[in-house]
Design a protein with these regions (language model features):
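Second-shell loop/turn segments in exported
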Residues: 33-38, 53-62, 140-145, 220, ...
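An extended, acidic, His-containing surface patch that forms the Zn2+-binding/catalytic region
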Residues: 105-107, 210-213, 217, 270-336, ...
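Active-site metal-coordination/substrate-binding segment of hydrolases
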Residues: 107-177
Length: 474
């Protein structure tokens, strides 16, 4: 996942951990961390994962086509025809598409998306070689073992097993694996263009189950939206001069005052259908003082006390509004000279439905200084929209997750960073993060050192995908 390593940490805030004993009464989603997959499909998911981790698909290494070739061979061995699997190169990377024919070939297809690339890892910093899969103490260690080769492996193994068993979906099911989600998302954009006739996207790189310290599930998150990541460059210039002769203006002073205003400003709160569903679904597991505010805001977004309570908590402030904060500043050219220019970076996470240009204009209004220019820094992100919570999709998710963990709270939400879903939502295609990894918060090392996946999640994770697909495409 790009920019925000693991979206579940945003959808289920850390403050909810305090309430785990009251929320963890559902059946365990997995037995012990040492449990390895026992089913043929689960074992195949592990084999795919090991092969994928051993292929260092870091940007610039040219290994995405290599991994795509290995995936293609596996798909062919499961009964896919050669003309149903294609790889489209794009520079040193590319994307893979595999089409599983359905009964109605004219209907719009359902997509399963994941990404083959990973972020860099320095072997000297790791306890184990990050690109040599190691199974130890019930975990598989290696770069990408969690983000996102676990999701890719389980969804792929699930589909291959269904194909071998002769299952035929109601309409075409398409596997679409991108090759640069962690960097430019150029393959994602091209993939979304090529598959723009899709009816629905299921993203293996978002959503998932949260376990408490005892290994019991307390919530499952469904990603149905993303905040737009945006950086803005603020620039102010001044004639400068010798520091012994200060004038009426100073670029550092002007920028400091502007950044103080940005820091103090609160964007208007918003309540969308997704936010409302999240707050109502999360309130039962939240500490009492927060739960009341969540319910109150979901009922009345003008409730001042509820707004104040949620705004005061970093875990929640981003759920109810756009946030913008100063993150970098640079200026001056000599200790004894008045600064001729100062630049600052303001990072924003924009609420779905609000455009980057609207935020830029609001920031200009906030600082109220026409001498300071504000420029959006294009990093490939798109204005974000939410996916409607379709009854057929949410019903299928309920069935698949509750088969694995009866009674578990299923909470829709949005992530603070971008995934491949961004490009599909921008085309009006609903996308849902429905990852099948269940794990404890202290096991989440995506993008970090010693990234790992609990092996016990593989068997039930594959089964979750199969139930989801057979329910949606029956």
């Amino acid at each position: 996942m790009r920019m925000n390593p693991f979206c579940r940490s945003f959808v289920i805030p850390a403050v909810l951990l305090a309430a785990l004993p009251a929320a963890a009464n559902a059946a365990p989603a997995q037995a012990t961390p040492a449990e390895e997959p026992a089913t043929p499909a689960g074992r195949e998911a592990l084999a795919i994962l090991e092969e994928a981790v051993a292929t260092p698909t870091v940007a610039g290494r040219g290994q995405v086509p290599v991994l795509a070739g290995k995936i293609r061979e596996r798909l062919l061995s499961a009964g896919f025809k050669a003309d149903e699997v294609s790889f489209t190169p794009l520079g040193e990377t590319g994307y893979l598409v595999a089409r599983y024919p359905g009964r109605d070939r004219k209907a719009k297809p359902t997509l399963i998306i994941a990404h083959m690339d990973v972020v860099e890892a320095k072997p000297e910093d790791w306890e184990r070689d990050p690109f040599t899969p190691v199974i130890e103490d019930g975990y598989l260690f290696g770069r990408g073992s969690l983000d996102n080769k676990a999701g890719l492996s389980m969804s792929l193994a699930a589909v291959m097993d269904l194909r071998r068993k002769g299952w035929v979906p109601a309409h075409d099911l398409v596997l679409a694996f991108s090759g640069d989600e962690e960097t430019q998302m150029a393959t994602t954009a091209a993939m979304a263009d090529a598959l723009s006739n899709a009816d629905l996207v299921l993203n293996a790189d978002a959503g998932g189950g949260e376990l408490d310290a005892a290994g019991k599930p307390f919530a499952y998150s469904v990603q149905a939206g993303e905040k737009t990541y945006a950086d803005y460059r603020f620039t102010v210039t001044d004639p400068g001069g010798h520091s012994s002769r200060p004038g009426a203006t100073n670029a550092i002073d002007a920028m400091s005052k502007a950044m103080e205003k940005v820091w103090a400003y609160h964007f208007p709160v918003k309540l969308s259908p997704l936010t409302k569903a999240y707050l109502e679904g999360s309130a039962p597991s939240a500490p009492a003082e927060v739960a009341g505010a969540m319910r109150a805001f979901a009922s009345d977004p003008d409730d001042a006390q509820a707004i104040a309570t949620l705004t005061a908590r970093p875990d929640y402030v981003g759920i109810i509004r756009t946030t913008c904060v100063p993150t970098m500043i640079e200026g001056g050219h000599a200790p004894n000279a008045l600064p001729q220019s100062v630049t600052a970076n303001v990072n924003c996470r924009i609420f779905p439905g609000t455009t980057r240009e609207q935020v830029r204009k609001q920031l200009a209004t906030v600082i109220a200084n026409p001498e300071i220019t504000i420029e959006f820094i294009d990093n490939g992100t798109l204005d974000s929209i939410e996916s409607p919570l379709r009854k057929d999709v949410m019903g299928a998710i309920d069935k698949a997750v509750h088969e694995r963990a009866p009674g578990l709270a299923i909470v829709p939400g949005m992530s603070a960073g971008a995934t491949d879903s961004m490009h599909f939502r921008a085309k009006g295609i609903p996308a849902f993060g429905v990852g099948s990894v269940f794990m404890r918060a202290d096991d989440e090392f995506a993008h970090g050192l010693n990234e790992r996946l609990p092996l016990a999640t593989l068997d039930p994770g594959v089964k979750q995908w199969q139930t989801l697909l057979k329910t949606l495409l029956k």
